[in-house]
Amino acid sequence: MTVDTITSTSNGNQDVPKEFFPKEFETQLLHVGRFPDILGSCAVPVYSSAAFEFNSVAHGARLLNLTQFGNIYSRFTNPTVNVLQNRLAGLEGGVAACAVASGSAAVVVTVMALAGVGDNFVSSFHVHAGTFHQFESLAKQMGIECRFVKSRDPADFAAAIDDKTKFVWLETISNPGNVILDLEAVSMVCHTKGIPLICDNTFGCAGYFCRPINHGVDIVVHSATKWIGGHGTTVGGVIVDGGTFDWGQHPDRFPQFHDPRTRLWERFSRRAFAVRCQFEILRDTGSTLSAPAAQQLLVGLESLAVRCERHAQNAAKIADWLREHPLVAWVSYVGHPNHPDHQGALKYLKRGFGSVICFGLRGGFEAGALFCDALKMVITTTNLGDAKTLILHPASTTHEHFSSEHRAEAGVTDDMIRLSVGIEQIKDIKADFEQAFEQVLRGKKSLRKPCIGKILLQDEINEDLFGPSACRT
């Protein structure tokens, strides 16, 4: 029996008999990766154990040599986390997955698994601000160069690739610019050059709206904090190996898969990348997703289809409504026919156009900030994908440290407001917006008065914890 076919009834890595494997996405959200619990638990149990007992010395040796899969140490193997990994791999159409502590950790683990000192990779310029900073600063500290491509043209990606390029990175729908690149065209460029295509599919909602692997993408990453968790309770990330890239064809470019000590490609074939992420990079960096966090994300997944259906319905209605509002200068929503990437949305998105809208108010920066401050129900925060409606003014928060030129190139205008539409009754979302619009028109600045006491108390606590006096002994 090869390693790829080894099964287990104790850690969620077992193969489900084909005749019982649920075919529909909505059913897979609840059942893929489950394993029989010895005590009969219907929910996936939380295995809060730092380490796991070996049956024998020989058993421990097999696990550590990866000639048998099983639980060793929760830094990189845990039964609860394994269920999450298997479920997300199935939902995305991959062969294996590696769950990590956050979306940012998923980015770093992926980069470290493929690139090293002297290497480079190519990324779309239109990526999440945190990812951009990782690529521009952290990768550079590791001796890895990121080459940003600002255009949508696949030929420009091809021109940036050389013999030291390890992969191309892009996002399904860029955050916050709502840019959709042609996955299949960029994939063709990558595979012609002998490198994998990686896609951050956070906005694709674990395959509900988009399954990039079906369109030539080789590796998918997620911030599981967003729609996967869905309730703003848990931070997590995941890397899904599509099993589509042939590492065996490129031993000189990817020697890490042909190391004579580990022989990842020879032993694990299509799962080689996922095995490297979990049993080498995650093991060594400790960017671990805890078992309780994994269970929270699994609970979130169970309602993902129901939530995303409502997210998409509300977003479409809000986008149309905003477009007609006299105070709104513009709306960016990939579901609108006049959006520059609407054809890409029709090609790559199913079940709807996502739940993120960007728009600007007449009155620019000040009006946008005033509007956010005036909201009473909608929450101003950096998060996305919550069941609750969330809003952000990027120019004064996530993109404040970027130059005005950079913000303009990324499509982040001073008046931009990013809206993550929740699943509330749409009448209440509109009502909150209407009262905030009224306050903007009146030019009110003394807003959220009921929160002043809470804000002052929080400021006092923060000063005690993080201020200069906190360092005194």
From Swiss-Prot:
Superkingdom to which the source organism belongs: Eukaryota
Record-level GO cellular component terms: cytoplasm
A Pfam match: Cys_Met_Meta_PP
Pathway this chain belongs to: Alkaloid biosynthesis
Single GO BP term: cysteine biosynthetic process from serine
PANTHER family: HOMOCYSTEINE/CYSTEINE SYNTHASE, HOMOCYSTEINE_CYSTEINE SYNTHASE
Name of the featured protein: Sulfhydrylase-like protein lolC1
Gene name in the database record: lolC1
